[in-house]
Amino acid sequence: MVQQTFTGRKRVRKFFGHIREVAEMPNLIEVQKASYDQFLMVDEPEGGRLDEGLQAVFKSVFPINDFSGASQLEFVRYEFEAPKYDVDECRQRGMTYAAPLKVTLRLIVFDIDEETGAKSVKDIKEQDVYMGDIPLMTMNGTFVVNGTERVIVSQMHRSPGVFFDHDKGKTHSSGKLLFAARVIPYRGSWLDIEFDAKDIVFARIDRRRKIPVTSLMFALGLDGEEILSTFYKKIIYKRAKSGGGSDGWRVPYDPVRFRGYSTLNDLIDADTGKVVLEAGKKLTVRAARQLQEKGLKALRMSDEELVGMYLAEDLVNPKTGEIYAEAGEEITEKSLKALNEEGYKELPLLDIDHVNVGPYIRNTLAADKNMTREDALFDIYRVMRPGEPPTLESAQNMFQSLFFDAERYDLSAVGRVKMNMRLDLDAPDTYRTLRKEDILAVIKTLVDLRDGKGEIDDIDHLGNRRVRSVGELMENQYRVGLLRMERAIKERMSSVDIDTVMPQDLINAKPAAAAVREFFGSSQLSQFMDQTNPLSEITHKRRLSALGPGGLTRERAGFEVRDVHPTHYGRICPIETPEGPNIGLINSLATFARVNKYGFVETPYRKVKDGRVTDEVVYLSAMEEGRYHVAQANLPLDARGRFTEDLVVCRHAGEVLPVTPDKVDFMDVSPKQLVSVAAALIPFLENDDANRALMGSNMQRQAVPLVRAEAPFVGTGMEGVVARDSGAAIAARRSGVIDQIDATRVVIRATEDLDPTKSGVDIYRLMKYQRSNQSTCINQRPLVKVGDIVRKGDIIADGPSTDLGELALGRNVLVAFMPWNGYNFEDSILLSERIVKEDVFTSIHIEEFEVMARDTKLGPEEITRDIPNVSEEALKSLDEAGIVYIGAEVRAGDILVGKITPKGESPMTPEEKLLRAIFGEKASDVRDTSLRVPPGVQGTIVEVRVFNRHGVDKDERALAIEREEIERLAKDRDDEQAILDRNVYGRLADLLENRQGIAGPKGFKKDTKITRAVLDEYPKSQWWLFASPNDKLMAEIEAMRKQYDESKKGLEQRFLDKVEKLQRGDELPPGVMKMVKVFVAVKRKIQPGDKMAGRHGNKGVVSKIVPIEDMPFLEDGTHADIVLNPLGVPSRMNVGQILETHLGWACAGLGRRIGQAVDAYLASAKQETKPLKETLKKVYGDNETIKSLEDHELVELGRNLRRGVPIATPVFDGAKEADIEQMLELAGMDKSGQSTVYDGRTGDPFDRKVTVGYIYMLKLHHLVDDKIHARSIGPYSLVTQQPLGGKAQFGGQRFGEMEVWALEAYGAAYTLQEMLTVKSDDVAGRTKVYEAIVRGDDTFEAGIPESFNVLVKEMRSLGLNVDLHNSKIGDMMPTSEAAE
């Protein structure tokens, strides 16, 4: 059993898992942190940094030479300076949390000898140059950009390397498989090599026009003969000597070559002349092997069997030099006759039998127009740069730069490793460009595939997809910025006087900084962090997206990419993915998975040696795993770790097969390694249908943090891990003793790793009522008392949605599964009034409103209490500066910040001028632009922040806020100082006590003993004056004093820095003089229309809140809190919720029994804990933690368990049906889990027993208050004059085409006309309606809707002139004569 933490002892979970976990789960946000640390490498290690991350970027761009080569700019090293503001300050001020990057550059100027061209160094200058700010990652793996927290999502993309594939027979009508190979570099040109329907091999560069692959080989420097000898074996056919039958050719016999050979004539042994195989038969593999065993060396072939073979070499007349036949030529009867006449005794032929080896490269060579390297290079040049006339030099350079130039082409280490593995090469992974051998090996492998040897690659295999995490994405982005900068530097180096210039003058860091800013601000992968609750944060950081730059697009991604692949096991969660268009493209990392240095996802396994499972854990990537047999984690083992079954089911190369135990190589570490964090939080996941489990994992991320969080009775054991790793709950950084505590901070006096250079005090600031990105409330509260002793890693404060250090997204409520008057029809949820009254599902949401006072061209705007035409009543909650008080209750329409804006002088009539002169009326030239509470919001002001531009006088309110902040900082400083004094003077007293004193403060008698009483006579600051004859002791005291002074100075300095930052003006956007942010806390009780869900995808909307007395109740009078429809279970197949209900019921029953034992203990005079211990032992069995508890800890535990005993049932290894029955029995309940339930309105029992129990319900972030919306008048669209749409724009509801049909069907003509005119876009009519209503009269006439005018304008723009003739309806009626 794991050693429980401080909070873990206060509430112990009963654990149902049977499988011992050997591997520690990696930190859940490691993906983000490790990747970015590797990129930044903030601290330079001994011996300099490795070539990776930022260092590699600088190394790849520098040195930069000018065009003439007379000077060179070299990169020496880089370092980061301290960030200007810390994370919290950045969040408040809307800044980016970043550190300035300082790069040391060296400029070398050369003297070039004009005759010899030799270079000699003339001058070297080194200088530190500022290269922009680089955003830093916070402790929790996020970035603060412009004041908001963002996450950079990792991207899944196709790994660089070579891929072989075919078109599945779709391209050509015959359904023939056309094979293709593609070499994908990390950056650079793509190379495709493909077959066409005629079996000719072509190459394409960057998806351009295709060229024969032989042209590519010519360009690589091969000639025709070399190409043939590379791809085909050569066989020498010798002329057989006459005798033993007719003439023929002697052919060496090779069983592999001749298998499947169909004979035209008899096959004859060349040595004996015997017939080996009669004509017209096929040589089987077995027969071919038997012939070899019988000693067959060679066969005799007749002339006609040579026809159709191809020559391997040029046949040249040695005397005249005349070429009879070229390599690759096909032998015809005519050419064979000619060769026989010339008397050739030996013919070198290509080993092409059209069965095992096809003539594809030979045919391509024959079809290729280009015959020389030059022609081929020109051809490639024309394809890549059409329209430019090629020269040999430019063509050579262009081809060289395509694949062989490290500046433009980079396979990356991954690409090289993958290429070596696929093609069986052994180039070192530092060799990042292509080589001739690589290209030839690719063509060879492709041809082999066409010949039926080998397998094509599966692109969805995780060995062929890799993850680009933050560090790598950032590295690519920064490289782009530096390359933009490089061009500018080169030009500048050539244009300035290089002798007088310093590196600083050559560098403009803007492009690099802009690239970084653009990436964090607007990249598709830089996302606004989902901060609804701690789980949603963690999931967001562990997300893998196939979208984004260089990835897929939603529209083009097919079914295969989105589907679950066998290699996902233990690496990517098969359950958690969004519903909708992104399904399968956005995935989540599995719980135990990690990303290796090459970007492949790895998962841990236990090693199996000789059929025995060891505790050694090995991480394997998908490529490596395919070679082994891997067993499941839940297989039964005996005490020695051997498999108990004779056949073990294993996964091997994507298949599942039974093997004997000695063949097993690895075993899973844990059953939950296959799912993601969110899915691992669902108890009884194994009993839910996958579609519902997907909804369950997605909906847990939308759970709103409640005012009173409560950990689930039925958990999975993952709750503590999530709370700790997400950073929601605060863990102690060092062991120590709690020194001070209040609602906003915890002060710990450290008792371990007391580094003299570090402070001995840890102060943890708690976040109080802060707004999250999703407007939920972040609030932390301490869990410890003064004097508590905590160890490193113990939870000392709970955050949002955490309870005693465990994730608590919802509440345990008493559920009855039964219909109730149709109020739970179609997934509706019926709630008891108790839930509202006791604030069970109440949450706090914090809305932020801001207002800016700008400097306009008519004069500055002003934030003030003095607003024209506003009653004193409306100003009641504003202070003298015009800003709302903290604690004021506000509702829609109330003023939060008073602001007036100057408006332009409108021309005045002489009368007005006279009045203005007499009464001095000046207020009319400003208008009221105050910040008001938007509709639908009401709450309490919890915080106000005022930002002033540098040099603008601060108002009273700003000064008051500043004073408060400085007081808080001073208190922190004083507390830390006090603890420091106590520690130091305590140690000093221990050192001096009982020593001989040879000197001391004024009034101390020399050579007397220093005792505690003597010390207490003097103020502590004078203790340093005591001296003792022991030199070693004095040295120690001196060192201690030095250390103390430094700590004191450091403390004061930190305080002064922070105060200086506070008093300094704020950096505001241009033209803004002052900015005020107001935070309103809104308390949301649950109400009909809110969405709720369980953890099993069982979601619904609250339909009615019923008085407690009307709810169904149990025999003991307990009323149900929530009634769910039983019909929601069978069709959806999420039975997990029923099992959870039963187990929750047992938990509550056991909690009641423990509660009774605690009460008995408190009531008894002797205070005997034995009965309580017995009860706990019955529940928990043999639990180490419970045994180790003191009496008072036992009682506290008992109190905490009163509502219910929390249990953990891990996924795929949880409680079985028998366990649940046993728990119910232990709690003294019916094993069926059903109870007699009475109707709350009549008091009669229902006919059948009802399933009743505790279920964990969440309130989701889809609240009716945010969605409900109504409008009478409001803004209109400019062109169409129709009301805008949507709640955010205060828009109207669209009365669309189908709604019009409905009114037409009713025949409601007047209502319909109103809808389409005066209620929408008839501008004149709208005003008339208003006037009519004001007059109290209800007749109005509809005019021409604006949309008609828009139509007329559109027709005119098409050149159709439409004239409108206005006339009365009567005039338009046909006359009676015309009618007749």
Curated annotation (Swiss-Prot):
InterPro entries from the UniProt entry: DNA-dir_RNA_pol_bsu_ext_1_sf, DNA-dir_RNA_pol_bsu_external_1, DNA-dir_RNA_pol_su2, DNA-dir_RNAP_su2_dom, DNA-dir_RNAP_su2_hyb_sf, RNA_pol_bsu_bac, RNA_pol_bsu_CS, RNA_pol_bsu_protrusion
GO biological process, one term: DNA-templated transcription
Reaction catalysed by this enzyme: RNA(n) + a ribonucleoside 5'-triphosphate = RNA(n+1) + diphosphate
CDD domains from the UniProt entry: RNA_pol_B_RPB2 (cd00653)
Cellular-component GO terms for this entry: DNA-directed RNA polymerase complex
Record EC number: 2.7.7.6
GO-annotated molecular function: DNA binding; DNA-directed RNA polymerase activity; ribonucleoside binding
Similarity annotation: Belongs to the RNA polymerase beta chain family.
PANTHER family (UniProt xref): DNA-DIRECTED RNA POLYMERASE I SUBUNIT 2 (PTHR20856)
Description of how the protein assembles with itself and partners: The RNAP catalytic core consists of 2 alpha, 1 beta, 1 beta' and 1 omega subunit. When a sigma factor is associated with the core the holoenzyme is formed, which can initiate transcription.
Identification of the protein by name: DNA-directed RNA polymerase subunit beta
Record organism: Nitrobacter winogradskyi (strain ATCC 25391 / DSM 10237 / CIP 104748 / NCIMB 11846 / Nb-255)
